[in-house]
Design a protein with these regions (language model features):
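N-terminal glycine-rich anion-binding loop in soluble enzyme alpha/beta folds
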Residues: 1-63, 135-137, 141-171
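Hydrophobic structural segments
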Residues: 11, 37, 102-123, 179, ...
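Periplasmic-binding protein-like
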Residues: 16, 74-79, 127-130, 190-197
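Gly/Ser/Thr-rich loops at beta-strand to alpha-helix junctions
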Residues: 18-23, 80-89, 131-136, 198-203, ...
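A short, acidic, amphipathic alpha-helical segment used as a generic capping/interface helix at domain edges
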Residues: 60-66, 174-186, 191, 198-204
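Glycine/small-residue-rich loop that forms an oxyanion/phosphate-binding "nest" at active or ligand-binding sites
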Residues: 65-112
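Conserved beta-alpha
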Residues: 98-162, 245-246
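Short, flexible loop segments at boundaries between secondary-structure elements
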Residues: 159-164, 213, 217-237
Length: 247
């Protein structure tokens, strides 16, 4: 087959998602990632945005990590901002160290990738557009502060996990733009915007709001793809999806 080399993946990213179903993550991943980068998913079944719910899933997480290792992935990311926020940064970093010890593969999370990306961009003041309740938003802000980023403004819709799982795609897409715009308008000193969460389609908001406000806009996947490529020393800028991936 003449084009076999062009079709063979040059990087396999293992991704452990918090949810039983995976739709919006791969749908958006293959629009943001450079051609030839493969997403290899394994699913948890997170019942709620709490530490107890995350603890319940840890045995399955380790089984998935072993499976992803056998599949030959180059890196494993534990997806889901609520996972990191619920556990706190100290526990997350201990889990990442344990994962690397068990598998010999680099481990990261969406939250750690977001912090790495914001630090790279020089962002210390952040606005957030979120669908989550205030307790979770507070936990996200506390986690980011440990990484040198202060959340100075946020707009939220206060939805539960069950509500977010059933949110229509079109409604979620409109909500992402509305919340992001409102967050930046309410916090003019913010240096960037974060639209966290994997249960909604948000990639369209990146170029739209960056053009409108002249500030970087990040989502889970843009930060994770960027951090993965940079950690591997792979300079593969992606155009059209915001400042971060273009860098």
């Amino acid at each position: 087959m003449d084009n076999m080399d062009n079709l063979e993946p040059w990087y396999r990213l293992g991704f452990i998602t918090p949810h039983q179903f995976v739709d919006n993550v791969p749908y958006q991943f293959y629009r943001l990632a450079p051609p030839g980068m493969m997403l290899v998913t394994a699913n948890l079944d997170l019942a709620d945005y709490t530490e107890e719910a995350v603890d319940h899933e840890l045995p399955l997480l380790w089984r998935h990590a072993a499976t992803l290792m056998k599949r030959g992935v180059d890196r494993i990311v534990i997806g889901g901002v609520p996972v990191g926020a619920a556990l706190g940064r100290e526990r997350v970093q201990a889990i990442l160290a344990e994962g690397e010890k068990r598998t010999g593969i680099p481990f990261s999370t969406d939250m750690e990738n977001i912090i790495s990306a914001l630090n790279y961009l020089g962002v210390t003041k952040l606005a957030i557009g979120s669908r989550w309740h205030e307790g979770l938003n507070d936990a996200v802000a506390a986690y980011l502060k440990l990484g040198g980023v202060e959340v100075i403004g946020r707009k939220t819709s206060g939805r539960s996990l069950a509500e977010n799982e059933t949110l229509k795609t079109s409604d979620g897409m409109r909500l992402a733009v509305d919340l992001g715009r409102s967050a930046l308008e309410a916090a003019p000193d913010a240096e960037a915007l974060l639209l966290p969460g994997g249960l909604w389609v948000t990639i369209h908001a990146i170029p739209l709001l960056e053009a409108e406000f002249g500030k970087p806009v990040l989502i889970n996947l843009s930060a994770t793809i960027w951090a993965t490529l940079h950690a591997a020393g792979l300079g593969k800028p992606v155009q059209g999806w915001g400042r971060l991936l273009a860098s």
